């Protein structure tokens, strides 16, 4: 086959009949797949992985077929090109990797049960049935599934069940779609159903380990999201139902299978009466994200994985557009600023980072491009920039045209820009190429040169970076009308600054509302002019100042010592975005001090000065009629107060635990994690450890499980940390889907870092076998690099990971993360004394 040629270019399927007989006891699947399609050549190659092929026929004639497990293929010859029917008889395993067809495990009253589900994105449909497992190979699918069925069990799939004959469940034929979107599940389930105004059936399904009321919140959000998107896209939802299913074991956060969306339990089933605002926002945005995909990704699918951003970036933006419309009181775009924008700007500043549009071929490479900070966060930031530039009306007109033109088919990035550009009457292609095809982003340096206001763009790096003279078309979004809409040159000289300043009457600013993906480095006098008016600035502008100063300090373009004395100017804000941004900066200062050192005590004093008044105002409990800002700020402020060892905060947190000793799950959900962490840190014991670990093993509340994980990993007791690490490979205690959080927690704990670091090096082969097949695998390397800050750890990191540089899917991550750690080591060495002195001077 010619390099770069896809399998679909040789054989294009039109319809699959998939019969599966699944035995949970033996963990064996007997399958028979019939594929109708058209071949352009006589040598046919299908995808398969882990399949044992019994027989292959073409138009009723048996052919000799060869499997290649390295290439994940099944190859055979046919007499002549043209229309044909291929039938493959095979067996396949039920996997334990959360990929393909696999069991999820859970308990009810101590009895272990399982729920069978699927996860086929990116390239795991081939583990369930032979196929052209490429996004452009769209076809229709008819599922027929038999299983060792027990009483009270339910089976669901992309489409409604039509009939059951001799124990075989037959489902209606799907619309034309990609293989990775096929899905089904069976086992004991409960559900709640409703219907949209246009007649689409909406359902939420879970195991019976959950209380029925835990499905209500998701049902409401799902129903209203489908209704919102049908209106916003001006394109009807094309399937008869939209099922949402919580799986007990699930590697990703959620998956947009058309008509049967799957989720981690924590992202679907929640007790809305005792869930924090943050948890409700997370669940709502995840649901809205997956349902945005039903159009962006499912109805119109990227031609190949290099345009993954067409799916993920758009869904990431649309989750905020939808939830802002459905829950306007949440001010959800503020969450976008503190989470998506922050993560994108941090990750995208590392040399070697992927561009949003990136070339990939091998399955491991495809999985590795699911970089949340780039394809999701940066990509959505690009689209927010476009939306701001062309307006919502043009965006909606363009999307309607895009869906109409490419429905039930595939598209490339150029197709989207053509549709949006036509609707807006402007050429977006050239501008967006500078953002999507290039990695990184610019810093715009603003200065006054010979009296003239002058702008200059250059690529911004945190750590070492090779300047390749990249240039971006930057939407400047200035508050000074004299500036052009776009900066399309490396430098821009404007008019007399004093005259401009006098005419406008306010300090000069760029990127108003922080909608574009760049940061600004104002010369000291211009920055001071802005800071002199900080109280009159919007919350987003204050966040932006803190965000840009933090990044500039990380990139060593300014000193953190300059930033420290500015923090008090933001400490009394009642905006959650300002508080979040402020304590992100504070969090970054912690790397400059050693645990239990006089320097840490000084930093704690500073943080107490910043947070004490706010903590006294907010306390631990929600007040009547308090704002969303206060609800979101409370855990941020309380966490700061506990870091500061504020006596009132430490003691009152302990009192809360004592009052809820018999049912710690009943602690207020928004502050439960930090209250439990305080208890473990200051009042920890084997008894408390055992109580929390028992709760972790038995609760069906994913939020409570995360809180316990966050708390237990804070212990300074090495024996307890050794116990935690001993459970890393015990799936009865720590599910593989949750392991990364436990690993990260122990690694970030000075008392446990060596234990966790030794574990991952000693048991890397086990980790690779257990989670190496999914897109989360490389993030174990990422989280390690985020924590290490010493030259010794850098040396050890390189010694372990550099021999793995040639491993498919790991090359970029290892290279980047060596740079990340090296940058942090250099920054700490260079800035440590100055930062420590600045902290003392601020007391």
Label every PLM stretch briefly:
Residues 144, 202, 292, 359-363, ...:
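Non-catalytic accessory/interaction domains
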Residues 1-240, 266, 371-377, 387-393, ...:
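Acidic/His-enriched low-complexity segments
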Residues 57-60, 111, 194-199, 261-262, ...:
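Short alpha-helical hairpin
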Residues 103-105, 156-163, 185-190, 276-279, ...:
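Short intrinsically disordered coil segments
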Residues 139, 150, 165-166, 238-239, ...:
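Short, well-ordered loop/turn elements at secondary-structure boundaries
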Residues 25-27, 135, 252-254, 700-701:
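Short glycine/serine/proline-enriched coil/turn segments at secondary-structure junctions
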Residues 99-100, 156, 181-185, 215-217, ...:
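Short conserved micro-motifs at the rims of enzyme active sites and ligand-binding pockets
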Residues 53, 115, 171, 204-466, ...:
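Hydrophobic alpha-helical and helix-loop surface patches within well-folded domains
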């Amino acid at each position: 086959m010619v390099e770069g040629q896809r399998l679909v270019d040789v054989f294009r399927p039109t319809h699959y009949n998939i019969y599966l007989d699944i035995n949970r006891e033996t963990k064996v699947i007997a399958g028979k797949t019939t594929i109708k399609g058209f071949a352009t050549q006589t040598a046919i190659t299908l995808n398969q992985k882990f399949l044992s092929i019994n027989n292959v026929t073409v138009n009723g004639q048996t052919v000799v077929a060869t499997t290649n497990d390295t290439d994940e293929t099944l190859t055979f010859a046919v007499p002549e090109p043209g229309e044909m029917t291929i039938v493959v008889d095979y067996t396949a395993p039920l996997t334990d990797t959360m990929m393909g067809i696999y069991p999820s495990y859970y308990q009810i009253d101590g009895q272990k049960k399982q729920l069978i589900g699927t996860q086929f994105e990116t390239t795991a449909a081939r583990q369930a049935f032979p196929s052209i497992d490429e996004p452009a190979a769209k076809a229709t699918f008819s599922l027929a599934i038999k299983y060792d069925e027990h009483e009270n069990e339910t089976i669901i799939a992309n489409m409604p069940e039509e009939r059951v004959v001799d124990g075989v469940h037959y489902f209606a034929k799907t619309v034309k779609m990609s293989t990775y979107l096929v899905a089904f599940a069976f086992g004991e389930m409960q559900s709640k159903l409703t219907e949209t105004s246009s007649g689409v059936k909406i359902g939420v399904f879970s195991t019976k380990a959950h209380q029925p009321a835990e499905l209500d919140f998701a049902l409401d959000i799902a129903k209203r999201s489908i209704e919102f998107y049908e209106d916003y896209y001006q394109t009807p939802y094309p399937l008869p139902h939209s099922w949402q299913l919580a799986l007990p074991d699930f590697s990703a956060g959620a998956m947009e299978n058309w008509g049967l969306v799957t989720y981690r339990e924590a992202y679907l089933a929640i007790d809305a009466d005792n869930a924090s605002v943050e948890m409700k926002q997370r669940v709502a945005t995840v649901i809205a994200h997956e349902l945005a995909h039903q159009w962006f990704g499912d109805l119109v699918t990227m031609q190949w994985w290099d345009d993954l951003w067409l799916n993920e970036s758009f869904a990431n933006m649309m989750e905020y557009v939808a939830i802002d419309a459905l829950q306007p009181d949440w001010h959800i775009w503020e969450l976008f600023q503190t989470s998506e924008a922050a993560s994108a700007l941090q990750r995208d500043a590392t040399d070697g980072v992927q561009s949003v549009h990136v070339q990939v071929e091998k399955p491991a490479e495809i999985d590795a491009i699911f970089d949340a900070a780039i394809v999701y966060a940066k990509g959505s930031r690009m689209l927010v920039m476009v939306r701001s530039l062309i307006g919502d009306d043009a965006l909606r007109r363009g999307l309607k045209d895009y869906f109409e033109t490419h429905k039930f088919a595939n598209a490339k990035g150029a197709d989207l820009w053509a549709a949006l550009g036509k609707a807006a009457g402007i050429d977006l292609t050239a501008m967006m190429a500078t953002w999507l095809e290039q990695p990184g982003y610019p810093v715009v340096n603003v200065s006054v040169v010979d009296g003239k206001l002058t702008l200059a763009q250059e690529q911004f790096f945190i750590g070492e970076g090779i300047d390749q003279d990249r240039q971006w078309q930057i939407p400047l979004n200035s508050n000074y009308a004299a500036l052009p809409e776009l900066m399309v040159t490396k430098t821009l000289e404007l008019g007399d600054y004093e005259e401009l300043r006098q005419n406008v009457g306010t300090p000069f600013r760029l990127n108003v509302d922080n909608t574009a993906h760049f940061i600004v480095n104002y010369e000291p006098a211009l920055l001071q002019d802005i800071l002199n008016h900080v109280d009159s600035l919007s919350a987003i502008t204050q966040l932006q100042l803190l965000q840009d100063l933090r990044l500039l300090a990380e990139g060593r373009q300014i000193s953190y010592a300059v930033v420290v004395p500015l923090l008090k100017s933001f400490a009394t804000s009642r905006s959650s975005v300002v508080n979040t941004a402020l304590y992100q900066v504070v969090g970054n200062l912690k790397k400059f001090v050693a645990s239990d050192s006089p320097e840490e005590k000084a930093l704690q004093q500073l943080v107490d000065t910043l947070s004490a008044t706010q903590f006294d105002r907010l306390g631990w409990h929600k007040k009547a009629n308090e704002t969303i800002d206060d609800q979101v700020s409370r855990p941020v402020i309380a966490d700061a107060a506990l870091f500061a060892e504020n006596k009132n905060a430490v003691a009152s947190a302990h009192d809360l635990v004592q009052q809820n000793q018999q049912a710690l799950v009943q602690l207020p959900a928004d502050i439960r994690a930090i209250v439990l962490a305080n208890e473990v840190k200051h009042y920890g014991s084997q008894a408390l450890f055992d109580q929390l670990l028992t709760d972790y093993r038995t609760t069906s509340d994913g939020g409570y499980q995360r809180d316990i994980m966050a708390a237990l990993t804070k212990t300074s007791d090495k024996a307890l940390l050794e116990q935690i690490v001993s459970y890393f490979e015990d799936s009865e205690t720590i599910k593989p889907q949750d392991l990364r959080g436990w690993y990260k927690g122990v690694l970030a704990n000075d008392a446990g870092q060596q234990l966790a670091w030794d574990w991952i090096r000693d048991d890397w082969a086990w980790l690779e076998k257990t989670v190496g097949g999914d897109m989360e695998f490389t993030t174990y390397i990422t989280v390690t690099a985020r924590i290490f800050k010493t030259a010794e750890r850098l040396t050890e990191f390189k010694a372990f990971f550099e021999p793995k540089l040639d491993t498919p899917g790991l090359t970029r991550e290892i290279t980047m993360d060596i740079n990340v750690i090296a940058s942090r080591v250099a920054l700490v060495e260079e800035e440590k004394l100055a930062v420590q002195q600045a902290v003392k001077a601020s007391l």
